Regions:
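A catalytic-pocket lid/entrance helix-loop region that shapes and gates access to the active site
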Residues: 210-301, 306, 448-455, 459
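Cap/lid segment of the alpha/beta-hydrolase catalytic domain
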Residues: 103, 112-181, 227, 356-365, ...
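Conserved alpha/beta-hydrolase "acid-adjacent" motif
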Residues: 403-407
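Mobile cap/lid helix-loop segments that gate and shape the active-site cleft of serine hydrolases
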Residues: 341-381
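Short beta-strand/loop motif that positions the catalytic acidic residue
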Residues: 395-397
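Catalytic-loop region of hydrolases
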Residues: 20-103, 118, 261-275, 282-353, ...
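Short glycine-enriched nucleophile-adjacent loop
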Residues: 196-207
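Alpha/beta-hydrolase fold nucleophile elbow
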Residues: 182-192
Length: 530
């Protein structure tokens, strides 16, 4: 393999020389010269194939479909580390297709969960493009960075919240220019979950970094997402921390929601999935009464009241902290510690580890909102600095997603519409697609696994940004292949007529309005890295 790699390097370098181009060695030197006080280039290498695939530790939280791609040509891989302040250790990777095949684009790839590892970039190599990604620097918190009882240092939080993504982009562009001898013509960002928040942080804080952003099941209402899961924990656990519901009970409650709506939801959703996860209070009462008859154990004590609290907006002192969970998820409203991001670390630093969560109330939540969430959130409705440059955003929400509940995403889009001239004007630059049957990341929804991203979404974004064709729909396939389902831009819903033809039904708009104090977003000026 070593002989083959050397031969390939010589061959490629010879081809460049014949074409009057700078040699590959000189190109590598230019890449290394990008290094400065913030950036250390640790490896530049010609690759002939991808590394063997291991188990992805963040697969469950990667909010996009898996892509089986084959890397068939040589490419250059660049590993670099960023340290904008003492204690930062942001690992990054760029892949660069060979110059004769490069499409002139650079893609930023988002991460997932608490990150700490580098996402796979093979799909970009197969696309003959360039891409860059980062682990968001969270491993700098120490070997127990995933331990929720360990507070994260302030610098690590800054890197995770917004700084790592911006610096990754700045140096990724420099590396691409150094290799290709010219700047990229277009820059795009693709991310889901945490990656969706990364993309929206770029839109709001550094609007010149990208021309277009794919934000799949985004955690841009980051504080609200964690508050929602804290609320779910409170309602489904007793004072001793023990679960009040079995997994089977919660799954049966979700099944009851599907059955309850079967007579009113249109085809092909009826009896299979919830067409629209926004239930009125009367619908919540109705389906829970129906569920209690089918599942006698949830009629005990105050279980029905607790379940109603899960699905209804979370309101305290007249202020809405969360819109409520959407009924009908495949696994039921099961609490998962792994889905929480910054709140447990924050509470641990305030003397409330997991063992004391039964003592956490709105005083601690309000403290979290004041002290941490403004840099964590990426949910300012003012996207004008990005859209005035011609920037485009494709955003999705999943009606079966309980990790990043869909309600706050819909609320965010509505606030964007209010702040930017209405939905007609906003749809020229940003579109939201709410997907029935879509759970989070690698999660299994009732009819589909994963969420639409991959090549379909990338093509739609490029076509919108470069050719002016806005996405009229996206397509998802049911797992069993029985339905190829179009998804309309919000607030539309595709329904199937008796003859099998699809048509768009306009649905009501809006959800419960989250209070502004939960959504504060500090927009940091470029260059202000501390």
């Amino acid at each position: 393999m070593r002989t083959l790699m050397v031969a390939t390097v010589v061959c490629v370098a010879s081809l460049y020389a014949m074409a009057g181009e700078v040699s590959l060695d000189r190109a590598f030197e230019r890449i290394r010269s990008v290094a400065d006080a913030t950036c250390k280039v640790t490896d530049v290498s010609l690759r002939l194939k991808s590394d063997p695939k291991g188990k992805d530790p963040l697969e469950m939280w990667r909010a996009e479909a898996k892509e089986d791609v084959a890397v068939t040509g040589a490419f250059v891989r660049v590993d670099f580390t960023l340290a904008p302040e003492k204690g930062s250790d942001i690992k990054c990777r760029a892949v660069l297709t060979m110059p004769e095949r490069w499409d002139g684009r650079l893609w930023g790839q988002g991460n997932s969960g608490r990150a700490g590892s580098l996402p796979d970039l093979d799909a970009y190599v197969a696309m003959d493009t360039a891409a860059v990604t980062t682990d968001l620097g969270t491993r700098a918190a120490g070997p127990k960075f995933l331990d929720k009882s360990v507070p994260w240092p302030a610098g690590v939080l800054r890197d995770f919240h917004w700084r790592a993504t911006h610096l990754m982009t700045v140096y990724g562009k420099r590396i691409a220019k150094a290799f290709y001898g010219r700047p990229c013509e277009h820059a795009y960002f693709n991310g889901g979950s945490t990656g969706g928040r990364q993309g929206m942080s770029e839109v709001l804080r550094f609007p010149e970094d990208y021309d277009g952003v794919i934000s799949v099941l985004p955690d841009n209402n980051a504080a609200v997402s964690d508050i929602a899961l804290w609320h779910l924990w409170r309602q489904t656990h007793g004072p001793d921390g023990k679960a009040l519901f079995t997994k089977e009970e919660l799954k049966s409650v979700s099944d009851a929601a599907i059955e309850f709506m079967a007579n009113t939801d249109p085809k092909p959703y009826a009896g299979h999935i919830i067409a629209d996860g926004r239930f009125s209070e009367s619908e919540i009462d109705g389906f829970l009464a129906f569920a209690a008859k089918k599942i006698p154990s949830i009629a005990e004590a105050d279980k029905v009241a607790r379940l109603k609290a899960v699905y209804m907006p979370l309101v305290h002192d007249g202020k809405c902290y969360f819109t409520g969970f959407a009924p009908g998820t495949n696994s039921g409203v099961n609490f998962h510690w792994g889905s929480l991001l910054s709140l447990p670390h924050f509470l641990a630093g305030k003397g409330f580890p997991q063992s004391r969560w039964n003592e956490v109330g709105f005083d601690q939540i309000d403290m979290y909102l004041r002290e941490l969430s403004p840099e964590f959130n990426a949910c300012s409705p003012d996207i004008s600095a990005f859209t005035k440059r011609g920037g485009k955003i494709i955003m999705t929400a999943g009606w079966e997603d309980q990790t990043i509940p869909p309600g706050p995403i819909v609320d965010y889009y509505e606030r964007v519409c209010e702040a930017n001239g209405g939905i007609g004007e906003v749809s020229k630059s940003m579109r939201l697609f709410c997907i029935p049957g879509c759970a989070h990341g690698g999660g299994r929804g009732r009819v589909m696994t994963g969420s639409p991203s991959g090549m379909q979404m990338k093509k739609l974004l490029v076509d919108w940004c470069e050719n002016g064709r806005a996405p009229a729909q996206i397509h998802v396939k049911w797992r069993d292949g029985s339905v190829d389902m179009p998804v309309a831009p919000y607030p539309g819903l595709y329904r199937q007529d008796a003859d099998g033809a699809w048509r768009i039904e306009k649905r009501p708009r809006g959800v419960a309005r989250i209070d502004a104090k939960c959504l504060e977003t500090k927009v940091v000026l470029p260059g202000n890295f501390r």
